Amino acid sequence: MIHVKYIILGFIMVSSLNLYAANNDIIANKKVVKVEVSNEHLKTLNEASTLLISCVDFRLIDETDKLMKQLGLEDNFDKVSLPGASLALINDKYTYWGKTIEDTIEILQELHNIKQIVFLDHRECGAYKILIGQEQLNTKEKETAAHAAILNKARDIIKEKFPQLKVYTFLMGLDGVVEQIYEIPS
């Protein structure tokens, strides 16, 4: 009986998605899309030096790409996006997010020979508000301190599990200003 419920629920979910797509002309009518290849030379590459771990927030997609270019990493990084970026690695509610990050690092070391991790958190992050609480973020100083503590904890976890990798941590404002968060000496 349980199997039947799952099948029915799965059918309803798929039907709902199809109904949404049918009502969304921009997506529903696109059977095949040709996307212009901007970097033909990338087809032959099989390495990327860096894994960027950033938040899923749509507000900073372009700024994130610009940062990676300014860091000299354009066309030289893989990317994982999860709510909260570094918070995804250490939060107690969604522990599988941390496992996802660790598994991704493991496979990308083999696939793309990554040598470093860049964590990119951002200010006014909804995941931070939900998972650590608004009261810990209600001033710029508190917000910076909360991100710095979590970024440094994430750095420690990565260094312990993947000691051969360099880890860099950054905090981006919604205005595009990016601060590097340095390791707190023990």
From Swiss-Prot:
Its keywords, alphabetically, are: Signal
Pfam families xref list: Pro_CA_2 (PF20393)
Q: Which GO terms describe its molecular function?
A: carbonate dehydratase activity; zinc ion binding
Question: Which top-rank group of organisms is this from?
Answer: Bacteria
Presence of the UniProt keyword Calcium in the record: no
Record's signal peptide: 1-21
Q: SUPFAM superfamilies, alphabetically? A: beta-carbonic anhydrase, cab
For whether the record's keyword set contains RNA-binding, the answer is no
Q: What InterPro entries does its record include?
A: Carbonic_anhydrase_sf, Pro_CA_2
Listed name of the protein = Uncharacterized protein RC0076
Q: Which organism is it from?
A: Rickettsia conorii (strain ATCC VR-613 / Malish 7)
